[in-house]
């Protein structure tokens, strides 16, 4: 797994240019600022719940802090799983069922990012906070799911990851170990370290352009990615329904529904290559 990750990152690193030099070279187009035409730009995209909301995926987190009438502590923490695994499995079973409903499909924003990856190839990396598979279904392949994946489970003892499309019952066990261990959702809960962070920070240090889509800017470490990218000279872009908590950090900003602003941005970007 580790070698595959660094192989993917080495491809993203190809043709590294002088990052600081391009900061002094800007072209102004109306309300947008884009870097001077770069040869083989490396693009890192971060997506959050806002990109999937238009596909019918509920964000679950309500204004009162409840997730589907449950306290976060009960359904999205290791302690909650230890106290009541049945409740936690039922919660994620419902989310898994919803994701696989026929009406849940990638929207125009997902499809635009797949188009962008097709054009850029190995110079594109997508980091998502979402645990759905809509990016994959749209056609993206170079993806890091930093918060895990809903259609996977893992052994609570060995960490082995398994594909899983159906419900998970408390009595379901993983038999990869000498002693069968409970299965848990392959998702990152509060208090746990997000996945792929070493690879993500290395990619942030090499990106020419950093784009955040549908993120609130409330959740760290992802909220700090824009600052990290800027430190290394990347041009930063926010595509969101409204300004995020860290919106002031971005050099370029476009606001509106993801299904509208993302395809528009991608089309203009690709025309400038």
Swiss-Prot record:
GO terms for molecular function: histone deacetylase activity, NAD-dependent; NAD+ binding; NAD-dependent protein de-2-hydroxyisobutyrylase activity; protein-malonyllysine demalonylase activity; protein-succinyllysine desuccinylase activity; zinc ion binding. Changing residue 1 to A: Complements a cobB deletion, produces only the short isoform. Has deacylation and phosphoribosyltransferase activities. Its EC number is 2.3.1.286. The active site is at 147 (proton acceptor). Induction: Most expressed in mid- to late-log growth phases (at protein level). Has 3 promoters, P1 (upstream of nagK) gives rise to a nagK-cobB transcript, P2 (within the nagK coding region) gives rise to a transcript able to generate both CobB isoforms, while P3 (nucleotide 44 of the long isoform) can only give rise to the CobB-Short isoform. NCBIfam families: PRK00481.1-5. This is NAD-dependent protein deacylase. The gene is cobB.
């Amino acid at each position: 797994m580790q070698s595959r990750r660094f192989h993917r990152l080495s491809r993203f690193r190809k043709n590294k240019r002088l990052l600081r030099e391009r900061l002094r070279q800007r072209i102004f187009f109306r309300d947008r600022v884009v870097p001077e035409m770069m040869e083989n730009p490396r693009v890192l995209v971060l997506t959050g719940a806002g990109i999937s909301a238009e596909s019918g995926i509920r964000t679950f987190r309500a204004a009162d802090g409840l997730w589907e009438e449950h306290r976060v502590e009960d359904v999205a923490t290791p302690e909650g799983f230890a106290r009541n695994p049945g409740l936690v499995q039922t919660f994620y079973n419902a989310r898994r069922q919803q994701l696989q409903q026929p009406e849940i499909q990638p929207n125009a924003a997902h499809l635009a990012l797949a188009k962008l990856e097709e054009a850029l190839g190995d110079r594109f990396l997508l980091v998502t906070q979402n645990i759905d598979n809509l990016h994959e279904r749209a056609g993206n392949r170079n993806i890091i799911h930093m918060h895990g994946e809903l259609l996977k489970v893992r052994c609570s003892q060995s960490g082995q990851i398994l594909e899983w499309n159906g419900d998970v019952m408390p009595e379901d066990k993983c038999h990869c170990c000498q002693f069968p261990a409970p299965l848990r959702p392959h998702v990152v809960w509060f208090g746990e370290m997000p996945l792929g962070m070493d690879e993500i920070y290395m990619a942030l240090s090499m990106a020419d352009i950093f784009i955040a889509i549908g993120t609130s800017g409330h959740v760290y470490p992802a909220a700090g990615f824009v600052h990290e990218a800027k430190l290394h000279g990347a041009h930063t872009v926010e595509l969101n329904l409204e300004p995020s908590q860290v919106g002031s950090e971005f050099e370029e900003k476009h606001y509106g529904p993801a299904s509208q602003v993302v395809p528009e941005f991608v089309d203009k970007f690709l025309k400038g290559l």
